[in-house]
Amino acid sequence: MTIDIKDISEKDRNTVLHPFTQLKDFATGKLREPTIVETGKGIRIQDARGNQLIDGFAGLYCVNVGYGRTEVAEAISRQAYRLAYYHSYAAHTTDELAILSDRLVKMAPGKMSKVFYGMSGSDANETQAKLVWYYNNLRGKPTKKKIISRERGYHGCSVVSGSMTGMSFYHDHMDLPLPQICHTGVPHHYWGANPGETEREFSARRAAELDEMIETLGPDNVGAFIAEPVLGTGGITPPPEGYWEAIQAVLKKHDVLLIADEVITGFGRTGSMFGSQHYGIEPDLITVAKGLTSAYFPLSASIVGEKVYKVLEDGADRVGAFSHGYTYSGHPIGAAAANAVLDIVEKEDLPGNAREVGGYFQAQLKEKFAQLPIVGEVRGVGLMGAIEFVGDRENKKRFDPLLKVGARVSKAARDRGLIARAMPHGDILGFAPPLVTTKEEVDEIVAMAEKAVRSVMDELVRDGQKL
């Protein structure tokens, strides 16, 4: 199909309110023209001008099975022809929904019981908050409502989930965070550790800080702790050694529920089916989205543990119906898409590929970047990784933010045919390619990234920056 690029660009600029975009710069043309993405195959996309790009970020960590999977498209089409929609209120269901729910309960870590569906990770975390509050009301603990998140954690950008997100620019001018949401310290050893402090010692200190926060707030006022197994948007930061063991001990001590936000790490990204399995996490509630349908259809799920669900069911005679749900909860097309995606994940062992190819990817990142004078840390797990740039490597000092080093490297990579994300916190280049990525494609990604980094290093030297 041939499109009129100028016409589409004008329509887009005149009518689309783009997320996370400087609105005045976009409206006046100061930002680049809209990128009109037309097609995708494997780990590559193509724009309307014919430019091919390796998508080193799987859209937004989500196109795990790669682009152009006909088996998923066909599953969506079959379901749309057969039954495009019916709701799941009042005990209505479809075969695809029941099959998907059974699969999720069986594959999820811990003792899970039920699955509630939404359309995005943000709304799924809104559901988790309501479940925590509902659960504690039914237990006769009406004050046990505060939810603790982490600085630099990302859990969405709606009202409650945006409050959970621990980055101030998601709150500024939006009247967030809500008072029920608190934030504890980020578990990033590179920046947060005291001199000589080991990872285990640092983890113990972070756990002690959480314990102190709960004691200060009052254990009868704290209902849940929400966290990603691996910090995602906050910098693609795996937890330090001993972190999850120490954190879970604090939560059990104070009868605080653990919500594992697996929106990014679910369905193979770390090399395990769930990040919780990778790190020995035993959650009470699990949030999934993105990889659930590989973004072929919007669908999210809040997976509810037995402990929580039993309280909800036991309280039903007293409080009546579970009064929460969306028009599109359990959408049959979304369920069909998810089942087709999970078939691919299991048949092609994508967690295993993330483990094997991801190990190669991590090794290549360290080999090519760890010793560069502007690189402070190379980190990651499975098929997610990050390079963090610093102005003074020896003394761990950041670049002047006005230099926008991370954004410049991201642009230089894009100019060379690679999408790698400038992460919003610090000068960080992030990677999260589709889980179908091969070692040969890793070589392409790393080679393009290396050229981009070195080109920006040359620019900095020309501008008089001492490296």
Curated annotation (Swiss-Prot):
Enzyme class: transferase
The protein's Enzyme Commission number: 2.6.1.-
PROSITE patterns per record: AA_TRANSFER_CLASS_3
SUPFAM superfamilies per UniProt: PLP-dependent transferases
MF term (GO), any: pyridoxal phosphate binding
N6-(pyridoxal phosphate)lysine, modified sites: K290
Keywords: Aminotransferase, Plasmid, Pyridoxal phosphate, Transferase
Keyword Transmembrane helix: no
Cofactor: pyridoxal 5'-phosphate
NCBIfam families reported for this sequence: PRK06105.1 (NF004767), PRK07482.1 (NF005684)
Family according to the record: Belongs to the class-III pyridoxal-phosphate-dependent aminotransferase family.
The protein, known as: Uncharacterized aminotransferase y4uB
